[in-house]
Amino acid sequence: MKVFWDGHDAKAWDQAHCRLAGALQQDWAYGETMMALGVACLRARVERDGQPLALAQFIARRVGLIATVALCAHGPLWLQPLSAREKAQVLVALKRQLPLWRPRLALFSPDETEATSGLRWPGMTRVVTGESTVIINLEHSDAQLRAAMDPRWRNRLVAAEGAGLQVQRVGANPAQYAWLMEEELKQRLARGFSGLPLGWIHHYIHARKHVSKTALILRADAAGERAAAMLFLIHGQVATYQVGWSSEAGRDLNAHNLILWQAIQELRQRGVRRLDLGGVNTQRSAGLARFKMGSGGEVITLCGTYM
């Protein structure tokens, strides 16, 4: 089993990532964006007997002055069917051949559920339990999607559809969505939340030639005033919910229910097969968790982080 840390082709990586409906963190543009912000990114291709088995993208950070931690989040991308034992062999090979000075630590959080991962991977130790996320299958019909919604969520959607809200698309040029980033910053400061730097979103959107195909930003207006907005990042056949904001009026009118429903229609037209609403934290963000889980998507618990 050989690991190649250079000589990668961005187009071929993107094609594999799209075909496999890969997560945002394994997207080539994700790594390019992190490097633009001064964060180290490592990419690997694993082969056996000349046949490619996996692609893996790591984000590496120094921890104090002691060690470097490299995280392969929601990866690797498996290029062909492998058993749990074979996958473990790939992870061990990546860990052993990581091109960083010691002391170093390689972490993997595969984009797999506990049921599909096998959990017991020889040579790997789970150090963190898996997070849960909500996935909406956009290949389902409108009738199927609405039937899967929590009845209260669906009732709020129906109410929003009759509330006179005007939903429109926001352009992907920075000046067109700068106000949304300002609102997101206010939310983070008020609630004590952290996340990717807001500048990261701008860099990611513009890491590709066609910025309009990389992001979907929808805004709902009530009585001529901004009431709510949601921003989704598109990577291949998957979209990930990234930013959401609502005014008091927007919350009263259930604007986010309507925006999400219209985003589903728009993303489906763009060829997106799956919408990832992101992590569910019922303790710190109970309201947001209820919104995501009520949308009718499938709650998936990933297998965790391994070293």
Model-derived features with residue positions:
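A conserved beta-strand-loop-helix scaffold within acyl/acetyltransferase catalytic domains
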Residues: 3-49, 55-65, 112-114, 121-129, ...
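Active-site/acyl-donor-binding loops of N-acyltransferases
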Residues: 2-10, 33, 60, 119-144, ...
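A short, internal acetyl-CoA/4′-phosphopantetheine-binding micro-motif in the GNAT/acyltransferase core
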Residues: 73-83, 139-140, 244-253, 281
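Short catalytic-loop micro-motif centered on adjacent basic/acidic residues
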Residues: 106-107, 168, 274-278
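Non-catalytic accessory segments adjacent to catalytic cores
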Residues: 86-130
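Aromatic (often tryptophan-rich) hydrophobic motifs at membrane interfaces
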Residues: 91-96, 203-307
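Acidic-and-aromatic substrate-binding clefts and catalytic sites of carbohydrate-active enzymes
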Residues: 80, 112-116, 281-285
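Residues at the N-termini of beta-strands
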Residues: 69, 103-105, 238, 274
